[in-house]
Amino acid sequence: MEIEVKGHSGCQIDVINEKDGVFVYKSTADSKYLNRLALQAVKQQKAGAVEYQHIRVPRIYEVKQTDTQTIVKMQYVYSKNFIEFFEQAGFEQVEYLVGALKYFVEYEIGKSKLQTVSASVFQIKFSDIYKKVELNPLFVNNEDIKNILEKCKEVFSNMKDMNIPVGICHGDLTFSNILFNGNNYYLIDFLDSFIETPLQDIVKIRQDTAYRWSQL
């Protein structure tokens, strides 16, 4: 049995039934993403070495990287996606989820240190996003997007250096990157971030709860 799934990052995801079990293979042949996928696998391995309350991380079995392709072999988890979970969950199950995510983020904060981060780090990131949005044909004539970008531009241009916790984070902690297995929640698709801070995870999960960011 082999099932091919389209990944949100542009990676190919294959679910393959082998002699010793079912495994997930995540791969890319995109030269810009080869090293990133390998780094993300390492990040997932490190997170998987920690014991969290109700939070689990699929095991990474193998990472193969060549000049033309990166392939990551990992544990397959029988689970529900977030839509199936919330359709069937009662208040108790939702409370378990909230508690588990809270514990996970608090652990990250505890492993991080307050550091002064230069405003230029965020300004460079915003500049990169600004250029990508400008070049996106879907947004060229969208006045609302233009107004938002200009307001953001003003905010970032006046930004000062700030003290934030720097250390570890998932990088893309959204509901679409959580697999639901009973009262265990498997985090997938760890992302190497432009800055490793738990604030990334807080913002991402709030982005989901406030603006329904996740899509299947």
Language model features with spans:
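Conserved N-terminal boundary motif of the eukaryotic protein kinase catalytic domain
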Residues: 1-5
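ATP-binding glycine-rich loop module of kinase domains
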Residues: 9-42, 83-84
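Active-site acidic catalytic loop and adjacent metal/ATP-binding pocket
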Residues: 13-16, 154-200
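Active-site ExK catalytic segment of metal-dependent nucleases
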Residues: 24-32, 75-77, 189-191
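Conserved kinase catalytic-core helix
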Residues: 47, 80-129, 141-162
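Conserved HxN/HPN-centered segment at the entrance to the catalytic loop
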Residues: 49-65
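A glycine-centered beta->alpha junction motif in the catalytic cores
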Residues: 66, 71-91, 132-138
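Active-site activation/catalytic loop segments of kinase-like enzymes and analogous catalytic loops
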Residues: 200-216
